[in-house]
Structure formats: structure tokens, C-alpha cells
Design a protein with these regions (language model features):
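Mature extracellular/passenger domains of Gram-negative fimbrial/pilin and adhesin proteins
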Residues: 1-157
Length: 157
């Protein structure tokens, strides 16, 4: 038999709780009729990434953090396609739609591959909160599976 051990050692003021390292956000089954124009959105789903054991004391403490989400963009040149997270290239994938991640505080889109606005850290625990939804990149959205993946990284300041 085999036992695998995974993890990492980080030089950071906080650590991400294990349950938030890998999440699945259910955006549900959305009718194509919901997307009546370019930029139309599905109902949002909130999610968070909780940081724990935050130590923001000492000399030159790191008290702020940004997050960057990286993933495959929506194929093509539709409105906002490069800013959103693509739902796949398979023939069974939905077309002209992507997943948006927005900052819960301001409802501002966090563009694919671009760091977010700054979040302030609190001693102990801080939860970074977001909203996700499907967004159309063209006037006509075609049905299909709509699963996207985004990797995240944190930069402390």
C-alpha cells in the first residue's frame, strides 16, 4: 500500500483553512432565456476563502492581501471573454458564456489573471468573500455543460 502526504510550508501571516483550498461552487441549472443580452448574468452564488491563524503583529507586519484567480478564458472575442473563466472547449460545453468572480464588498469583477483589490487582514481570522455567476459574452448563449476551474494565489503586503 501507499500513503501520500501533501502540503506546503509557507512564509505568510495566515494560512488558508483546508476546507477552502479546494471548493466546488454550484451555479445551478440556468435557462438560456436568462441571458437576454451581452453581459447578462445568472443569479449570483456567494463563496469565501477563510484565512486563519493570522499574525499581523511584530516588526513590519503583513496586514493586507490580494488574491489572483487564474484559469482558461472564454474562447473567442466576445465581450469580456478574456476576463471570465471558460466553461470548456468540448462540443458538449455551453457557448458564449463564462464564469465571473466578483469582490463581494463592491460587486467588482476580479478579472482572470489580475490581482484583486486589497483586503485588510484581521488578527486571527479573515474571510475573503466573493460572488460568482455565469455571464454571457454574446447575445445568444448556447446550452451545454458549464464547468469552470480557477486556481487562486495570495500575495501578502
Amino acid at each position: 500500500g501507499t500513503v501520500n502526504f501533501t502540503g506546503s510550508i509557507v512564509n505568510a501571516p495566515c494560512n488558508v483553512i483546508i476546507g477552502d483550498l479546494n471548493q466546488t461552487i454550484q451555479l445551478g441549472q440556468v435557462r438560456t432565456a436568462k441571458f437576454t443580452a451581452v453581459g447578462a448574468k445568472s443569479d449570483p452564488q456567494a463563496f469565501g476563502i477563510k484565512l486563519e491563524n493570522c499574525d499581523i503583529s511584530g516588526t513590519n507586519p503583513l496586514t493586507k492581501v490580494t488574491i489572483k484567480f487564474d484559469g482558461d478564458p472564454v474562447p473567442g472575442t466576445g465581450a469580456g471573454a478574456s476576463e471570465l473563466f471558460g466553461v470548456g472547449l468540448a462540443t458538449s460545453a455551453a457557448k458564449n458564456v463564462g464564469v465571473e468572480i466578483a469582490d463581494y464588498r463592491t460587486n467588482t469583477r476580479i478579472k482572470n489573471g489580475v490581482p484583486s483589490a486589497v483586503f485588510n487582514l484581521a488578527a486571527g481570522e479573515t474571510t475573503l468573500r466573493f460572488i460568482s455567476s455565469y455571464v454571457s459574452t454574446a447575445a445568444a448563449v448556447l446550452p451545454g455543460t458549464a464547468n469552470a476551474t480557477a486556481q487562486f494565489s495570495l500575495v501578502y503586503q
